[in-house]
């Protein structure tokens, strides 16, 4: 899985000088932009201009260009030839496609995790579940979203299916983005606790039902989040128009 820690921190050698090479600069920039898109700092449709990003992140345009290519491959960025890139705007069709894939992928991952998990993996899943609950209670929205995504990633690891893990890595950014649309963090944490319990008891039938319900919750959360943002935009527009007419 991708590191969602503090991506702006640069590595240094023993003498205190920077040891970042071209490759590590590209990785760092990619992580910064990926997190900012998933966390909602850079909104859908916003411009990603190489020159501006290079200045902002203190690098040349080469790692910016490579990072944008990588993020386009992950489905987070729309590259436009001979002009700037933009943060991808997921259409209803895009969301429907992702939900169809997740319906198969998530349920299979949870079922296999319930069947094949080991003690070490289960302990890792429990720790991540507990962390997500704590972050939710503390009101750490970004942290709770990242922890929720980590929970799903660990479940895929526990499936013991290498191909599922590879597919999970391919879908990782899209799924993290979708999970970041959840506003009811406590409800998500509660469902994760129920899923963990079913996995721990190797109850495949129960975990299948819970996973299907969890997917339904995810879709509902996304729809509510979209409605809330649209309402906020409308209210902001009305407020500006009212101020201009005064």
Describe the residue ranges of each PLM region:
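Hydrophobic packing residues in well-ordered alpha-helices of helical domains and bundles
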Residues: 98, 125, 144, 148, ...
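Amphipathic alpha-helical dimerization/coiled-coil segments
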Residues: 108-133
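Short helix-capping and inter-helix turn/linker motifs at the boundaries of alpha-helical repeat units
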Residues: 24, 122-123, 185-186
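Acidic/polar helix N-cap motif
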Residues: 91, 118, 140, 202-203
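Hydrophobic, amphipathic alpha-helical faces that serve as interaction scaffolds
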Residues: 101-114, 147-184, 221
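C-terminal all-alpha effector/ligand-binding and dimerization domain
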Residues: 2, 126-133, 138, 177-246
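Short linear motifs at protein or domain termini
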Residues: 1-111, 115, 219, 223-246
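Solvent-exposed, non-membrane alpha-helical residues enriched in polar/charged side chains
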Residues: 34, 38-39, 54, 133, ...
């Amino acid at each position: 899985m991708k590191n969602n820690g503090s991506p702006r921190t640069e590595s240094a050698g023993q003498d205190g000088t920077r040891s970042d090479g071209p490759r590590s600069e590209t990785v760092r920039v990619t992580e910064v932009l990926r997190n900012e898109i998933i966390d909602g700092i850079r909104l859908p449709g916003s411009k990603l201009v190489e020159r501006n990003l290079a200045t902002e992140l203190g690098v040349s345009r080469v790692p910016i260009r490579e990072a944008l290519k990588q993020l386009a491959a992950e489905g987070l960025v729309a590259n436009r030839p001979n002009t700037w890139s933009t943060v991808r705007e997921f259409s209803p069709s895009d969301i429907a496609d992702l939900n169809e894939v997740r319906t198969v992928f998530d349920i299979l991952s949870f079922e296999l995790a319930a069947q094949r998990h080991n003690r070490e993996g289960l302990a890792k899943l429990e720790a991540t579940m507990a962390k997500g609950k704590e972050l939710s209670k503390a009101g750490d929205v970004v942290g709770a979203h990242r922890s929720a995504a980590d929970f799903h990633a660990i479940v895929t690891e526990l499936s013991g299916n290498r191909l599922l893990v590879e597919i999970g890595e391919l879908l990782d950014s899209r799924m993290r983005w979708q999970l970041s649309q959840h506003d009811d963090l406590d409800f998500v944490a509660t469902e994760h606790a129920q899923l963990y319990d079913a996995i721990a008891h190797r109850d495949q039938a129960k975990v299948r039902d819970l996973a299907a319900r969890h997917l339904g919750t995810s879709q509902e959360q996304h729809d509510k989040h979209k409605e809330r943002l649209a309402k906020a935009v409308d209210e902001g527009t009305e407020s500006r128009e009212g101020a201009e007419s005064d």
